[in-house]
From Swiss-Prot:
Protein name per Swiss-Prot or TrEMBL: Elongation factor Tu, mitochondrial
Alphabetized HAMAP family for the sequence: EF_Tu_B
UniProt: GTP binding residues: 19-26, 81-85, 136-139
Biological function: This protein promotes the GTP-dependent binding of aminoacyl-tRNA to the A-site of ribosomes during protein biosynthesis.
G1 as annotated region, ranges: 19-26
Protein origin, superkingdom: Eukaryota
UniProt-annotated stretches for the region G4: 136-139
Species of the source: Reclinomonas americana
Pfam families on file: GTP_EFTU, GTP_EFTU_D2, GTP_EFTU_D3
Amino acid sequence: MSKEKFERTKPHCNIGTIGHVDHGKTTLTAAITKVLSETGGAVFTDYDQIDKAPEEKKRGITISTSHVEYETTKRHYAHIDCPGHEDYVKNMITGAAQMDGAILVVSAVDGPMPQTREHILLSRQVGVPSLVVFLNKVDMVNDPEMLDLVEMEVRELLLSYKYPGDEIPIIRGSALKALQGEIEYKKSILKLMEAVDNYIPQPERSFDRPFLMPVEDVFSIAGRGTVVTGRVEQGQIKIGDAVEIIGLGSTVKTTCTGIEMFHKLLDYGQAGDNLGMLIRGIQRDAVQRGQVICAPGSVKPHTKYEAQVYILTKEEGGRHKPFFNNYRPQFFFRTADVTGTIQLPKDVEMVNPGDNVKLIIELITPIAMEEGIRFAMREGGRTIGAGVVSKIIE
């Protein structure tokens, strides 16, 4: 069967749902597709389809990242449903990096919970520029004052992570009731989408910069070759363009021989697109998650850099104790996850939770990086720091 061509008419935006486990992120994602499907803006995707990776079923919690697409009158959206449970924050770090904006889902029954805080922090550290809040399960709260209190708490939390908590739209509703077709709650979904349309700015796409796409996954397709998937971070790619694959080892040169998005063929891909790229003459095992595909000569792999880093407090889910020179956590750059050694400044004996400090970091394998890129520091399955590269050393 031949694939249909992907039409670019409306501006495109990548968003996602974030928030605490069981606050209703996946139900809301399903409800958005249901309500928008009634005006032809989406194909209804039910909860089980969004929550679909095999290991997810066993634990009843969302683990991997699901992509759905829909459109409003203003924009076309690719929506990511992010994992909620802290065991799977690793996935969120790479997932949240794919967002131009996010819908923070907070249960009106519980109010903000530990992962609500962690996801706001992660959004801040991976550079999600703006958030809209959906106060879910309001049908289960009888006292309007209670809703006002929860809303106030959410606004204060957003402000504490340097988001404009006073102006962020907070929409009250019930994703489940909307999914069940109750008119009042379907209206709250439309109101939410209106807030997303108007409040989350149309991202400035860096079309003019050299092409770069972090590698998320690699597949081998019989008779066609190797396909690499990811979200284009900057620039454009056309069929026939030369590219380089960089990081985690030697640099490989190849050519882009095909591009597809949402199972439709494209002539070109551009910043913001989640796409699959067919590459010529490269074996499946020569490319791995964590590398980047880029315009030849545009990016260099590095191992040593200076960074400004914020170390999370115990209350934020970070370390309980200080760390010292030569501490070795994991560093997350885009989709890469690499061990590195930390060198403290000469006048600093140790770094305590809550400190903001300049560090020199040396990774065990080179990663494509440039000044201004953000990264996360993790240890034993939890985020312990957020940083930005201030200077490349080697």
